Each structure stands twice: as C-alpha cells, then as structure tokens.
Amino acid sequence: MKIQPLGDRLVVKVAEVAAEKTKSGLYVPDTAKEKPQEGEVLAVGPGAFNDKGERMPMDVAVGDKIIFSKYGGTEIKIDGEEYLVMSQRDILAKIN
C-alpha cells in the first residue's frame, strides 16, 4: 500500500470481526453487528501545526494497535482492501 496521510491523519487497518453465531445456530449478518473499534496503524502523517507554527509529533507510530471512536474516520478501499483514514483526535487509546 502506497498512501501517505497528511497533517495529523493516519491510516488504520480495522481488526477483523469473527463470524458470530447465535445460540440457536444462526449466523449474524455483518449489517447487524457493532462496528469494530480496534485496528492497526499502517501509515502516519507528519503531525499538525500548533499556534506557534511548530509541528506537533504524533502519539502513535506504524504498527501500533489502537482503539478509536465508534464513528471516527473515513472508510476507503485500496486494492480491494478496506481501511480507515482518521485524525489523531479520533484515537481513544493504544493497546500494549
């Protein structure tokens, strides 16, 4: 993947959700499931500028596992794969 986010944005590969099955054996369709809120950072922008014109460093790096806001980010598709492009402010926590 060749994509470089700008400013304080990053590209995230959303964690796969395992197929859910009810107690009676029925599979739950993707449209009925909660949106996943975990993923892996694949690309990071250079950071936003503060009021003094200085670039602020990003709090995450490529390879970090994160938890992000439920409705954070914009879905994109590259080479048949789905990703999210989001602002750093949409990140809630890093997973260690």
Curated annotation (Swiss-Prot):
GO function terms (MF aspect): ATP binding; metal ion binding; protein folding chaperone; protein-folding chaperone binding; unfolded protein binding
Alphabetical UniProt keywords: Chaperone, Cytoplasm
GO annotation terms (biological process): chaperone cofactor-dependent protein refolding
Pfam families recorded: Cpn10
GO CC annotations, alphabetized: cytoplasm
Keyword Hydrolase: no
Compartment list: Cytoplasm
Record has Cytoplasm as a keyword: yes
SMART domains assigned: Cpn10
Function according to Swiss-Prot or TrEMBL: Together with the chaperonin GroEL, plays an essential role in assisting protein folding. The GroEL-GroES system forms a nano-cage that allows encapsulation of the non-native substrate proteins and provides a physical environment optimized to promote and accelerate protein folding. GroES binds to the apical surface of the GroEL ring, thereby capping the opening of the GroEL channel.
Protein name as catalogued: Co-chaperonin GroES
Organism: Syntrophomonas wolfei subsp. wolfei (strain DSM 2245B / Goettingen)
Gene encoding the protein: groES
